[in-house]
Amino acid sequence: MFDYRNHAGIDRAHGFIRGWTVTSAAAHNGTQLRNVVTKDNTASTVWADSAYRSKTNEEWLRDNGLKSDIHQRKPKGKPMPETMSRANGRRSKIRSAVEHVFARQKDKMKLFIRTIGISRARVKIGMANIAYNMLRYVFHEAKRATA
């Protein structure tokens, strides 16, 4: 494997990474939902892109008392209905917070994984996740101090 993926669950209110896992890029996103959604999640709604939508994930969320607000896929061979498009647009406003985390790690923190083996990649990505949370903590503390 030469490419790795960081799957992260983000706290919507404060932007902290609450749960994360690292897989090879070949692994399907949908299988990682249970690893990034923490059981102590105070919010009852889970937002994710359409790769995480499956019957097993929907059942798991329902069984754990969580509401699914996962993007819906376009019907094959048909245009996306307007209502579905608007619903996905509403979801994107919230889900984009996760993309901001990855963008910050890549651009500002210069995260670039050039390791051999997933265990080394996991350590490097894990350290980047911890550093990101520390930056968020400093941001919130500075914001609180000026208030």
Regions from the PLM with identified roles:
Residues N64-Q72:
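Short hydrophobic/aromatic-enriched beta-strand-loop microsegments
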Residues G15, A51-R53, P75-K76, Y132-L135:
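Short, glycine-/Ser/Thr-/acidic-enriched flexible segments
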Residues V22, Q72-K76:
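Short, acidic/turn-prone active-site loops that include or flank metal/cofactor-
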Residues H7-G9, T21, W47, D69, ...:
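Structured core elements
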Residues K39-N41, S50-Y52, K76-P79, H100-V101, ...:
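Short C-terminal domain-edge/linker segments immediately following a structured domain
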Residues E59, N64, R86-A147:
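Basic, amphipathic alpha-helical segments enriched in Lys/Arg and hydrophobic/aromatic residues
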Residues T31, T56, G77-M84:
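Short, charged, surface-exposed secondary-structure boundary motifs
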Residues M1-N64:
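Polybasic low-complexity intrinsically disordered regions
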